[in-house]
Amino acid sequence: MLGQDALAAPTPVAASEAFFRSLQPFGATYIQTRAYRRPRARLTSDSHWSAGGFILRYAPDGWVDSVAFDYVCFENNPLLDAIRLGQTCYRFSDFAPRNRRFGRYWEALAEARIHDALCATSYGAAGAIASLHLGFGDGGLGPDEARAIQMAGLLLTERLIGFGLPDAPEGPRLTPRERDALAFVAEGKTDWEIATILGLSESTARFHVDNARRKLGAVNRSHAVARLITERLL
């Protein structure tokens, strides 16, 4: 079975290395594996990178931290859409078609000898994500072959999640009243309207909103609503 050695490997690094070795005869030239937790903040190139969890990256000398590397990782990273959509199997070219718009993107990847890349991603509890990016130096993989490699990749990413991740950091704890009051702020309600809906005095409604804002580390109510959304509390 393709990638079978990875399943018996004792560590995430060993599993990733074994998987890459098994795919090199198929033309694999690049690998990156990660196991991390999805950022609580809005998903951007920076927050995605800061989530860490890098296990193995094999690339040509000098490409990592090059201008080309920074471009595909930070300046123009279309693969964030795959995470937003919860995609498990895809190619880089599914999100970055080979057209004029993404010309510079593919030029940057070519410096790492990546003609295209196959991806497999597993999603676990508490925002756990394990991902595989496997680059190939030419476009010779047919659809059936690519699909078989992606299925094997999912076995690897499930194995990586199985090794375990650090506990998720605990988010702000809002009381049910604080959460409800701020949710009504998100709907554009005034303190008086919130008080009427919740059966409270106006000053008590304001108290709950202000408490929620402070717990979320927000500078004003609009900021608090944004934090409520990014913390997935709404």
Task: Annotate the PLM regions.
Residues 163, 167-204:
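Helix-turn-helix DNA-binding segment
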Residues 109, 131-140:
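Short beta-strand-to-loop transition segments that serve as allosteric relay/switch motifs
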Residues 208-211:
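Residues within the DNA-recognition helix of helix-turn-helix
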Residues 118-125:
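A short, hydrophobic, proline-anchored segment that marks a local hinge/packing element in signaling
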Residues 5-6, 18-118:
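Regulatory input/activation interfaces that engage signals or partners
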Residues 1-5, 12-13, 136-175, 183:
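Juxtadomain coupling helices with adjacent low-complexity linkers
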Residues 214-234:
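Basic, Lys/Arg-enriched C-terminal extension of HTH/homeodomain DNA-binding domains
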